[in-house]
Amino acid sequence: MSDSKEPRAQPLGLLEEEELITSSMNFFPRDFGFRQTRGYKSLAGCLGHAPLVLPLLFFTLFTGLLVAILVQVSKNPSSQRLDQSKQDEISQDLSQLKAAVERLCRPCPWEWTFFQGNCYFISNSQRNWHDSITACQEVGAQLVVIKSAEEQNFLQLQSSRSNRFAWMGLSDLNQEDMWQWVDDSPLSTSFKQYWNRGEPNNIGEEDCVEFNGNGWNDDKCSAAKFWICKKSAASCSRDEGQLLSSASASPIAHAA
């Protein structure tokens, strides 16, 4: 073990302390406001109490940060009230728009499809042919009667897309092989091309007609199938069109 003792640090003299402070001042930016030629003695006193200065500095910064947070929090209720007021205003506009839309004249009811001045509805449930007629009558419509090749192509496409075999308003219940629509009009000769190959075959008293695949098929009227209703589209007045324009413009103006 060595008997030598570590040298103890000698306290700085006044001149040495001033030189140390003066040389240290070169590390401070000028923006801090410190000058080497003035006030270095007071700075020496502050540095001499560094353990007290740093906590004081941190406390000041923390206090300032806390005050800033409190100010921001105090502003939140006001901004929330403004946001709520804006939301209430938009909600009121939407309610007015909804009421206006409900009063508007629509060519077809919801879930109905418009085509060439008529409205069509493909059911989601199944009934026999006679009950399908009743179902259409209950909504002011008729089990579909086809009047043109364009209408036939449209309905055949709708039936195929929905993958549903659906009743139409055609049967030979009154007289075998005398096909007649529910409005008592006879089947046009030009429409016979729409029968599927080998149809109508009248196997087992098949007297009612359905959309089946890419054409028509006769089946038992007691079979449960989907059905297609048809009714004339409503005509809308000019004023109702203007109502829609004014109602739809209202929320846009407020939301801008």
Swiss-Prot record:
Membrane topology, Extracellular segments: 72-240
Location in or out of the cell: Membrane
Disulfide links within the chain: 108-119, 136-229, 208-221
One GO biological process term: adaptive immune response
Pfam families, alphabetized: Lectin_C (PF00059)
Spans within the Cytoplasmic topological domain: 1-50
Sequence positions that bind Ca(2+): 199, 201, 203, 206, 217-218
Gene3D superfamilies: Mannose-Binding Protein A, subunit A (3.10.100.10)
Domain of life of the native organism: Eukaryota
Domain C-type lectin: 114-230
One GO molecular-function entry: D-mannose binding
Entry GO terms, CC: external side of plasma membrane
Membrane topology: Single-pass type II membrane protein
Residue ranges the record marks as coiled coil: none
Remarks, miscellaneous: In vitro, is a weak receptor for HIV-1 and SIV and poorly transmits HIV-1 to permissive T-cells relative to CD209.
Descriptive protein name: CD209 antigen-like protein 2
Provenance organism: Macaca mulatta (Rhesus macaque)
